Amino acid sequence: MSHKAWQNAHAMYENDACAKALGIDIISMDEGFAVVTMTVTAQMLNGHQSCHGGQLFSLADTAFAYACNSQGLAAVASACTIDFLRPGFAGDTFTATAQVRHQGKQTGVYDIEIVNQQQKTVALFRGKSHRI
């Protein structure tokens, strides 16, 4: 694990009101890699009483943000897609793992997998980053 990646993540987390509000915690960091978790609360449920897709997107996007900023070079999302594969419910704990697939001078591609507490895949997210 990279000490620099952890420092960068903690510096970002200090200002990340969204991640804090969603109860997202950083579990692991390295260059181009991040693992974050979130427990689904009743406030995160949609009208079908399953986890709202926007909450899943936010979890994946947070892992993506920490991974693509792990080297200390500021980056933002330029495009993202997500595939929802199975529902989640109140009390479920989701883990999002982000891994770099390509990092050029300006643009990067990252894949994020969200799994539940049974290690079953809940969603797959791909993010494209741009360094600013």
Report each predicted region and the residues it spans:
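A generic structural signal for short beta-strands and their flanking turns/coil linkers
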Residues: K20-L22, G32-A34, V76-C80, D92-F94, ...
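Hydrophobic alpha-helical segments of small multi-pass membrane proteins
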Residues: Q55-T62, C80-R86, E113-I114, G127-H130
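Detector for glycine-centered tight turns/loop "hinges" at secondary-structure junctions
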Residues: Q49, G72-L73, Q119
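Non-catalytic linker/capping segments at the edges of enzyme domains
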Residues: M1-T37, T41
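Hot-dog-fold acyl-thioester-processing enzymes
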Residues: E14, A19, T39-A63
